[in-house]
Regions:
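Residues that define the transmembrane beta-barrel architecture of outer-membrane proteins
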Residues: 1, 49-53, 104-110, 158-162
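Residues on the lipid-exposed face of transmembrane beta-strands in outer-membrane beta-barrel proteins
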Residues: 2-8, 55-59, 112-116, 126, ...
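Transmembrane beta-strands of outer-membrane beta-barrel pores
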Residues: 8, 22-28, 61, 78-84, ...
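Short loop/turn motifs that connect adjacent beta-strands in outer-membrane beta-barrel proteins
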Residues: 9-18, 62-72, 121, 171-173
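Transmembrane beta-strands of outer-membrane beta-barrel proteins
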Residues: 16-20, 55, 70-76, 112, ...
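Oxyanion-binding "anion nests"
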Residues: 23, 46-92
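Outer-membrane beta-barrel translocator domains and adjoining extracellular loop/strand segments
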Residues: 29-42, 84-103, 135-150
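Outer membrane beta-barrel transmembrane domains
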Residues: 121-174
């Protein structure tokens, strides 16, 4: 696992930081529950290689580097996960029987937000975040051993969510 951050000041009122992180693991029989195409709850397992890349950044502004009265903070992160290994369907043989095949996937997620303190004790902000199920290659589906409907949680999903913030804090300790 690796992580690195750099940053600095821009004038007397602005600071920034950017980072890059890489995490890797090799799970063995990492399980998750799903409901297959027959409506039966099944437990599936993944074994293989998982890699996660994270990019992050923050920009802070405060007049004369004094955030007590007015300040603004812009930050965001991007995540990308890739997996390569084997997928075991229905490890408990609760439905269509246990089957195994290859599995490759890439998913991503991100958020960006800005928070502005316009006077002591008051802040407003906006955040937008999203996930992307990305691309998957499921050997059991590609060979026709299972229908994609048997693994619905691995299907495409790309939610987006906007969030507004209005905050009043009666003290600096919240």
């Amino acid at each position: 696992n690796l992580s690195s951050h750099v940053g600095g000041d821009v004038g007397a009122s602005t600071a920034w930081q950017a980072g890059l992180s890489y995490l890797g693991t090799s799970p063995q029989n990492r399980t998750y529950r799903d409901v297959d195409s027959t409506g039966t709850e099944v437990t599936n397992g993944f074994s293989g290689r998982t890699r996660l890349l994270v990019l992050d950044g923050v920009l802070k502004w405060a007049p004369n580097n004094n955030p007590a009265h007015t300040n603004f903070k812009l930050q965001g992160e991007y995540f990308r996960r890739s997996e390569n290994g084997g997928l075991t369907y229905d490890t408990q043989a609760a439905s269509l029987g246990t089957r195994s095949g290859s599995y490759r996937s890439r998913q991503s997620g991100w958020y960006a937000q800005g928070v502005y303190q316009f006077m002591p004790e008051w802040r407003v902000g906006y955040r937008y975040d999203g996930l992307n199920a990305g691309t998957t290659s499921i050997g059991l589906v590609n060979t026709g051993a299972l229908a994609a409907a048997a693994l619905p949680i691995l299907g495409g999903y790309a939610p987006r969510r906007p969030t507004l913030l209005a905050d009043w804090s009666s003290s600096e300790f919240g």
